[in-house]
Amino acid sequence: MADLRDEKGNPIQLTDQHGNPVQLTDEYGNPVHITGVATTGATTGHHDHGVGGASHGGVGSTGLGGVAGAAGLAGATAAAATHGGSHGGTGTHGVGPTGVGAAHGGTGTTTGLGTGTGTTGQTHGMGPTGIGGTHGVGSTGIGGAHGGTGVLGQTHGMGPTGTGAAHGGLGTGQSGLGSSYATHGGLGTGIGTGSAPASAGSHSHAPEKKTALGEQLHRSNSSSSSSEDDGQGGRRKKGFTTKIKEKLGGGKHKKDEHTTVATTKTTTAAHPGGAAVAVEHHEHEKKSMLDKIKDKLPGHHSPTSH
């Protein structure tokens, strides 16, 4: 049983956090009667040991009263001199404003989060310092530094020097990145040099001069008993029968003709005496062979027998 009043004498009803009336008992479950006046700003109540004596101090407000589960205003009310009855010392349990109120402010948490986030953000500056300006791959890495293909293209000018228009030099220049394409205009020069072998086959032969004496010599040599005129400007070999007929029919006349030609040839030679002897000796051997053949044939006699 609690008979509590405020400073103006109004009764104060003890309830729990849900507004339900609270029955005060001691540690053995016996009802406890509390009387007192609540005043503002008092932290220690009027200690009247009352019925329970000093041994039952602090059970009411601490265990089941408004202090238990008190938040804010309820804690402040319970911390006043409400427990000035027989259960003294209850007022010291002022848990309200100190435990739950502003004392538990998030200064530490707020400061910690704010400071940590700021420092981390500035340190990890991935923007312009990390990737932006440092990794300038564009102009320095691939652009002008790798423009060496054009120089190689100019060095390999195979067109005008090597073979001519067949190579032309233009294909070699295209191996660059496009910067040296116009420089390799060696096509015109290659055509001029390459046309040098065009004079092949223009060999001229001096006309062969023939004298009347040379023609006579050619005819005399070609009119031997081994060949005859084929009617087309050439010579063909005589048959054995044709040779015998010539020797039998007009052999004497032909032999005289051969002797005359041989004599003419020896007269125009550089050494007439020696050449004439050699030819006449050759004709003499031919006559001996023919005379022998005629002697073997019936009805004919050797020219030497006449």
Swiss-Prot record:
Lineage top rank: taxon: Eukaryota
Bias (Basic and acidic residues): 205-218, 243-259, 279-298
GO biological process: cold acclimation; response to abscisic acid; response to water deprivation
Biased composition (Low complexity): 32-44, 194-204, 260-278
InterPro entries from the UniProt entry: Dehydrin, Dehydrin_CS
Composition bias type Polar residues, residue spans: 12-23
Comp. bias intervals (Gly residues): 85-119, 127-151, 159-171
Region (Disordered): 1-57, 80-171, 188-306
CC per GO annotation: cytosol
Family: Belongs to the plant dehydrin family.
Protein name: Embryogenic cell protein 40
Native source organism of the sequence: Daucus carota
